[in-house]
Amino acid sequence: MKRRRRWRGWLLFLALCFCLLCEAVETNATTVTSTTAAAATTNTTVATTGTTTTSPNVTSTTSNTVTTPTTVSSVSNLTSSATSILISTSTVSGTRNTRNNNTTTIGTNATSPSSSVSILTTVTPAATSTTSNNGDVTSDYTPTFDLENITTTRAPTRPPAQDLCSHNLSIILYEEESQSSVDIAVDEEEPELEDDDEYDELWFPLYFEAECNLNYTLQYVNHSCDYSVRQSSVSFPPWRDIDSVTFVPRNLSNCSAHGLAVIVAGNQTWYVNPFSLAHLLDAIYNVLGIEDLSANFWRQLAPYRHTLIVPQT
């Protein structure tokens, strides 16, 4: 009987210990793992023995690409344009062929003869207005032409006449003060003259400076001459300056052969055909390349005695 009681006591004791052990295990040995995934948040629960720790680990990565639109407004470039004429200064070299297939020599420097010649050209156009339909003037401008030096090569042959419609030259003509009148022989054939004195009787002594002045307008070309005083370097004291030259009609735009050049020097007046005067000027251009303006000058002019210069008193 005593052994059975002992065994019962031990069994009860073991059962009590077993129950206590089970409770301890249920209380202290619990592992909880919880993972919650959100769109931008992750909660991680770390399992520890006897302790439950919840550590929120928030990881939010946002990649924002902001595109700012660039607005380019259309800009109208307003260019204010005015009617204008572009004039350039140039130097033209060479020879000019005419209808007779001869080479024309233009201009020279009387004080310094050379094998090439030049003309100093000054062009001053008139003011021009642009008128609208209602008659209002919309723009006024006066274009200016610069100086232009034209250089050509002297021709070995006889040059043709220079048309005053293309070359209106300001010349200086002189007459001998001892002469009351001037007689110019008009003859198509070249006479055989014995000496240089006879040339002096036939030819009117003259000196000139070439300066071209052309007045351009929209309708026509206005020819005018400006006459300068004798240069101090020219040693021709017995000669007298020309007083005035007038072209009739004033505008030779149609290049009519009926025009006249009225030359006044002192108390004498000459009525010169502009075309004939052009022939004479060509002759002067051609011979001023010689070294001295002596008797050879008149001899060289002899082929051009058909030039009509009629003195009037």
Curated annotation (Swiss-Prot):
Residue spans of biased composition, Low complexity class: 90-114
Coiled-coil residues: none
Keyword annotations of the record: Glycoprotein, Signal
UniProt entry tagged with the keyword Translocase: no
Position of the signal peptide: 1-24
UniProt keyword Glycoprotein present: yes
Sequence segments annotated as region (Disordered): 47-73, 90-117
Residues annotated as glycosylated: 28, 43, 57, 77, 101-102, 109, 149, 168, 215, 222, 251, 254, 267
Family affiliation: Belongs to the HHV-5 US34A protein family.
Name listed for the protein in its UniProt record: Uncharacterized protein UL116
Species this protein is from: Human cytomegalovirus (strain Merlin) (HHV-5)
